[in-house]
Amino acid sequence: MKQKVLFHVDEMERWKLLLHNVKNLLSSYDANDAGVLIEVVANGEAVKAYIQEDGNSLRNKMESLAESGVLFAACNNALTGWKIAKEHLFPFVNVVPAGVRELVDRQTEGYAYIKP
């Protein structure tokens, strides 16, 4: 059975630890495992990490994880609050209407919740 894990981040300074945790979790599964489905939900100020701009030090790590199947979601309410247009986000980021709703929905679907 595939494990389902939900990572939550709402502070910019927590991103590096979160991405490290996601990478470690992915690495802990081998070819014999059923695998893991991981979604990262950002709300609050953490949505700023999804902005495509020169010097975004998290971009390469996020892109690599996205290529490995990790899903990234941004809270539309937070984007609106910070006046960030969807067009300025990385292409692998899915915008959800409300981050807290996404967290509730995924946990109802059986996702384990982790907030580093």
Q: Language-model segments: what does each one mean?
A:
Residues 2-5:
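Extreme N-terminal starter segment of soluble prokaryotic enzymes
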Residues 7-19, 50-53:
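Short, glycine-rich nucleotide/cofactor-binding loops
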Residues 18-31:
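Histidine-anchored nucleotide/phosphate-binding helix
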Residues 29-34, 65:
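Short helix-capping segments at alpha-helix termini
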Residues 35-38, 113:
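Anionic, Ser/Thr-rich low-complexity intrinsically disordered regions
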Residues 38-43, 73-76:
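Short internal beta-strands
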Residues 42-50:
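Short, conserved secondary-structure transition motifs
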Residues 51-116:
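A cross-taxonomic marker for long C-terminal extensions/tails that follow the last structured domain
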